[in-house]
């Protein structure tokens, strides 16, 4: 059985958004911390903090909503590179999500970053997910 912590994180955020929860609880790993940091820098989530449990650490991700009807800032999340089929792109082939309205998150040799940052630095890598 393959554990895909990135897909678990995206699913946790998606489910919490649909249920209009204030926070989403996800498993805390190095990559989920980096992904949460990128989401915070892009303004897609309010904040995140790590909670230490006896068995396993968790990340509490505070979600962002807009308007009186509490529409989520994150409308969709899509996992691209999966354990069974990895997806890579060099700096010339980096995808533009919804014509620049969304972001693609990449894992590069310089760390985890958005497509815009990777384009600016001129480095490619593994395309982890699309968020818009």
Curated annotation (Swiss-Prot):
PROSITE patterns registered for this protein in UniProt: RIBOSOMAL_S8
Alphabetized UniProt keyword annotations: Cyanelle, Plastid, Ribonucleoprotein, Ribosomal protein, RNA-binding, rRNA-binding
GO molecular function: rRNA binding; structural constituent of ribosome
Annotated compartments: Plastid, Cyanelle
Example GO BP: translation
Alphabetical list of InterPro entries matching this protein: Ribosomal_uS8, Ribosomal_uS8_CS, Ribosomal_uS8_sf
Cellular component, GO annotation: cyanelle; ribonucleoprotein complex; ribosome
Record-linked Pfam families: Ribosomal_S8
Family: Belongs to the universal ribosomal protein uS8 family.
Function text: One of the primary rRNA binding proteins, it binds directly to 16S rRNA central domain where it helps coordinate assembly of the platform of the 30S subunit.
Subunit structure: Part of the 30S ribosomal subunit.
UniProt cross-references to PANTHER family, sorted A to Z: 40S RIBOSOMAL PROTEIN S15A
Protein name from the UniProt record: Small ribosomal subunit protein uS8c
Source organism: Cyanophora paradoxa
Lineage start: Eukaryota, Glaucocystophyceae, Cyanophoraceae, Cyanophora
């Amino acid at each position: 059985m393959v554990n895909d912590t990135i897909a678990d994180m995206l699913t946790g955020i998606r489910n919490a958004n649909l249920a209009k929860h204030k926070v989403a609880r996800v498993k805390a790993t190095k990559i989920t911390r980096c992904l949460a940091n990128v989401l915070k820098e892009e303004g897609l989530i309010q904040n995140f903090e790590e909670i230490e449990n006896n068995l396993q650490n968790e990340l509490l991700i505070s979600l962002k909503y807009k308007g009186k009807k509490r529409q989520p800032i994150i409308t969709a999340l899509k996992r691209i590179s999966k354990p069974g089929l990895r997806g890579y792109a060099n700096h010339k082939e980096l995808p533009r999500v919804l014509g620049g309205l969304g972001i693609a998150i990449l894992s590069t040799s310089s760390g985890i970053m958005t497509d815009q940052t990777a384009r600016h630095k001129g480095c490619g890598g593994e395309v982890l997910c699309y968020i818009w």
